[in-house]
Amino acid sequence: MGRSSYKRLGDYIQPVDIRNEERKVETLLGVSNAKVFMPSIANTIGTDMSNYKVITKGQFVYIPDTSRRGNKISIALMQEEEAIVSQAYTVFEVADKSELLPDYLMMWFRRPGFDRYARFKSHGSAREIFDWEEMCEVRLPIPDIEEQREIVAQYEAITR
């Protein structure tokens, strides 16, 4: 696939902002620069968890602040059923999974080239931010869904 066939990610993803208003979800997760979720180490004693964001299986979470993260962007794909994350995180999902597989997109996010791109496109002085608008402007090859499935299957066969 040549560069001209790269597509704008923003045409395939949408933001999600569901809050834990009823405080039903208690599992609090963080996102590491290894691109996985981890149990939060934050001291939450006395913290009002109702403003935290609820995430569900198949959704992505990333930390827009790219400062002090080892030149990597912290992003992960949720594999569990439900959890909450900090309100400072950005949550999004693939709008139509018949056009773009979340697992295929996560493969793209794991590439060192994506980390370099995100750092280059981050802006700010004390805190550099890779905001939602920049995420939407990411361009990547999006082959037909069957080819995506094959690519993901090959990747998983190698990495397992």
Question: Which sequence ranges carry the predicted segments?
Answer:
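A short beta-sheet element
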Residues: K57, V61-P112
